[in-house]
Amino acid sequence: MSLPQTYKRAVFKELGHPLTVEDAPLKLPGPNELLIKVEACGVCYSDMYSQYNGLGGGFPIVPGHEIIGKVAVVGSEVRDWNVGQRIGAGWHGGHDGTCKACKQGYFQMCDSTAVNGATKEGGYAEYTLIRSESAVHIPANVDAASYAPILCAGLTVFNSIRNVNIRAGETVAVQGLGGLGHLAIQYAKRMGYRVVAISRGPEKEAAARELGADEYIDSNEGDSGEQLAALGGAALAVTTASTGEAITPLLKGLGILGKLLVLSFPSNLTLEPTDLLKYGLSVHFWPSGHPSDAEDAVRFAENTNIASVVEKFPLEQAQQAFESMLSGKVRFRAVITMD
C-alpha cells in the first residue's frame, strides 16, 4: 500500500473552536502501533469533550472514536495484524495491563486508559494511528459507514444490556430514539426482549416500530413512567436522555427488582430512595467496552441484521456533521466518510 507524504484531518485547534480541515505530515506507527487508512468514522456526542479538553488531551486534537478502515502500516512489534486487513477502533484507545481493572479483563476501565479522539488522535482523518491492543477485527464484507457506529453506540448498548442480566422474554424500555437509542431497540429486540420505545411526539412511533419496538410511549402525552407501568412495567429501562428530569419518571415504570440503566451524562439526576428501597430497584452505568466486546457487538449485529441508520458527510464537511449531531438535525447517526 503506497503512502502519501501528507494527509487531511479535521482538528480542534483551540478550546471551544470549530473543526478545521487541514493537511498534516503523515506519521508512521511506533513499535506497538498500527497506521489505519480510515474509511469511515462515526460522530458521537462525546466528541464534544475533545472540543473542550474534557479528558485533558490538549490541542490540537483530532476527534473521533468510531473508526473503521484498513491496516496501512504495521508496527515492528505487532504480530497479529497484516497490511490490508479490515480494522476498527472505538473509545478504548489502550490500557496498561497492570491495574486492577485490567487484571480482571475490564480494559476499558483501566486507570491509565487512552481514549481515541480524546487523549490521542482519532478518526476524523484520512489516516490515524492506534495502539495495537485497542484494535478491533472487522469483517471484510460489512459497510464501513453502517458499522462504524457499532464501535461506540452499538457496543455501549449491547455490552451494557448483556451485563445487567435480564432474562429473555422480559420487557426492556428504551428512552430516546437517537444514535444510541435506535441501536438499543434493535439489540434488545434481537436479544429476545419485549421492547417499549419512549420518545417525544407521535411522528416517531412508526420509526420505533420499524426498528423493532413492540410498544411506543409518547412522553408528551403524560408521565412516561406511569405509561410504562400501564403496559405492565419493565425489568430494565435504558435511558439516553441528557437531563435528570426526563430520567427520574422512569422509576415508576420499573417492576419489582427493576433496573435503570443510564447511558448518558445527565445533569441534575435526582433519585427518590423510597421507591428504590421499597421495590428493590437499582441504578446502573456501564463504560462501553474493550476490543473483544466490540467484536462481539459487531458479530451479533452481522448475524442478526442490526443496522445503524446513518447520514454520511465527506471529511471536508466534518464541522457540518458535528453541528448536525449536536443540534439533532441528524436523526440517528452522522458518519464522516473518506470516499
UniProtKB/Swiss-Prot annotation:
Record-listed Zn(2+) 1 binding positions: C44, H65, E66, C152
MF terms in GO: alcohol dehydrogenase (NAD+) activity; zinc ion binding
Enzyme kind, highest EC tier: oxidoreductase
Transmembrane segments: none
Matches recorded under InterPro entries: ADH-like_C, ADH-like_N, ADH_Zn_CS, GroES-like_sf, NAD(P)-bd_dom_sf, PKS_ER
Positions that bind NAD(+): 176-181, 196-201, 204, 263-265, 287-289, 295-297
Reaction equations catalysed: a primary alcohol + NAD(+) = an aldehyde + NADH + H(+); a secondary alcohol + NAD(+) = a ketone + NADH + H(+)
Record keywords: Metal-binding, NAD, NADP, Oxidoreductase, Zinc
Cofactor(s) the protein needs: Zn(2+)
PROSITE patterns attached to this UniProt entry: ADH_ZINC
A GO CC annotation given for this chain: cytoplasm
Highest taxon of the lineage: Eukaryota
Usage in biotechnology: Notoamides have been shown to exhibit antitumoral activities. Notoamides A-C show moderate cytotoxicity against HeLa and L1210 cells with IC(50) values in the range of 22-52 mg/ml, but the IC(50) value of notoamide D is greater than 100 mg/ml. Moreover, notoamide C induces G2/M-cell cycle arrest at a concentration of 6.3 mg/ml.
Residue positions binding Zn(2+) 2: C99, C102, C110
E.C. code: 1.1.1.1
Cofactor note: Binds 2 Zn(2+) ions per subunit.
Pfam family, one: ADH_N
Binding site for an alcohol: H65
Family the UniProt entry places it in: Belongs to the zinc-containing alcohol dehydrogenase family.
Functional summary from the UniProt entry: Alcohol dehydrogenase; part of the gene cluster that mediates the biosynthesis of notoamide, a fungal indole alkaloid that belongs to a family of natural products containing a characteristic bicyclo[2.2.2]diazaoctane core. The first step of notoamide biosynthesis involves coupling of L-proline and L-tryptophan by the bimodular NRPS notE, to produce cyclo-L-tryptophan-L-proline called brevianamide F.
This protein's name: Alcohol dehydrogenase notN
Species of the source: Aspergillus sp. (strain MF297-2)
Gene giving rise to this polypeptide: notN
